[in-house]
Amino acid sequence: MICGIDEVGRGCIFGPVLSAAVIFKGNPNFLNELDDSKKLKKAKREYLSSLILENSYYAFAEVSNETIDKINIHHASLLAMQIAYEKLDINCDLVLVDGKFIPKIKAKKIQAIIKGDSIINEIKAASIIAKVQRDKLMDEYNKIYPLYALNKNKGYPTKEHKEAIKKHGISNLHRRSFKFI
């Protein structure tokens, strides 16, 4: 079995970093439609996400903004990947992670692949479901913190988001360790 892992929200200034781990059940017929989540339109991501969830074993993990501020975004991203894999509770022959760093995962073989979210189907799938999951989370947070337009910026440091912070201050879910904050 091959497990693909990716994270989303690394460059955000609001909320958690979120990771997903994916193992396909068999060989689904939609694999040729997969791509890096950043290259797909929202409707396509959501469509593929539902197919991925139906045809895979998967797990999500979030690492909070408080933890990000304590251990830094790099270590928080690796921790989210580690937790997502551990939550799967399936021993894999091969674990492939997006990027150049390897989280602390106990597996027979683990490999980091730069641009893996554009190359490896399992990582592409993890990228897609992680992005859809985090976007939904930001839509929910937008109901609590409407001043920051999280439904539009998804927690990223857009011009409007930065202006809202200047005008209203930061919330308890903003990452205080980031330069702009």
UniProtKB/Swiss-Prot annotation:
Keyword Ribosomal protein listed: no
Cellular component per GO, a single term: cytoplasm
SS bond list: none
InterPro entries in alphabetical order: RNase_HII, RNase_HII/HIII, RNase_HII/HIII_dom, RNaseH-like_sf, RNaseH_sf
One GO process term, biological-process aspect: mismatch repair
Cofactor note: Manganese or magnesium. Binds 1 divalent metal ion per monomer in the absence of substrate. May bind a second metal ion after substrate binding.
EC assignment: 3.1.26.4
Domain RNase H type-2: 1-181
Subcellular location: Cytoplasm
Cofactor(s) demanded: Mn(2+); Mg(2+)
Binding site for a divalent metal cation: D6, E7, D98
Single GO term (MF): manganese ion binding
Catalytic activity from the UniProt record: Endonucleolytic cleavage to 5'-phosphomonoester
Gene3D superfamilies in UniProt: Ribonuclease H-like superfamily/Ribonuclease H
Keywords: Cytoplasm, Endonuclease, Hydrolase, Manganese, Metal-binding, Nuclease
PANTHER family per the UniProt record, alphabetical: RIBONUCLEASE, RIBONUCLEASE H2 SUBUNIT A
The protein's role, per its UniProt record: Endonuclease that specifically degrades the RNA of RNA-DNA hybrids.
Protein family per UniProt: Belongs to the RNase HII family.
NCBIfam families cross-referenced by the UniProt entry: PRK00015.1-3
Record-linked HAMAP family: RNase_HII_B
Protein name according to UniProt: Ribonuclease HII
